[in-house]
UniProtKB/Swiss-Prot annotation:
Signal sequence coordinates: none
Database matches in PANTHER family: HEMOGLOBIN FAMILY MEMBER, HEMOGLOBIN SUBUNIT ALPHA
Note from the entry: Adult goat and other mammalian species produce unequal amounts of alpha-globin from non-allelic loci.
GO CC annotations, alphabetized: blood microparticle; haptoglobin-hemoglobin complex; hemoglobin complex
Keyword set, alphabetical order: Heme, Iron, Metal-binding, Oxygen transport, Transport
Protein residues bound to heme b: H88
Function: Involved in oxygen transport from the lung to the various peripheral tissues.
Identification of the protein by name: Hemoglobin subunit alpha-2
Binding site for O2: H59
Amino acid sequence: MVLSAADKSNVKAAWGKVGSNAGAYGAEALERMFLSFPTTKTYFPHFDLSHGSAQVKGHGEKVAAALTKAVGHLDDLPGTLSDLSDLHAHKLRVDPVNFKLLSHSLLVTLACHHPSDFTPAVHASLDKFLANVSTVLTSKYR
């Protein structure tokens, strides 16, 4: 799915409002995913998955950092996320459906924290962006 100029603008503006909360939102999205889709917990058997756990917060920071990097390189997501794609495909072997579940959880988290900014157009742009990120992260599974 190609991001239009309007999509890119919406994604950059929305992520810009996330700012210093990115790590916290990443952790919240992970917690939301674990609660809503319990099967996703199987990829984190060594984590303390309780609310506010340091491990979930740390992984939320990693997720947020990767997305922040991706937002900064919207025209080269494959190059930007290549290492993460390798990691998830070859070492972690995460089922690709889980990226969609995390994307959904992140969209809900962003909508909860920024309801007035989460217009239908912004929602659609963020959804396309996260779908593109998911596609890149699963590209090396083939």
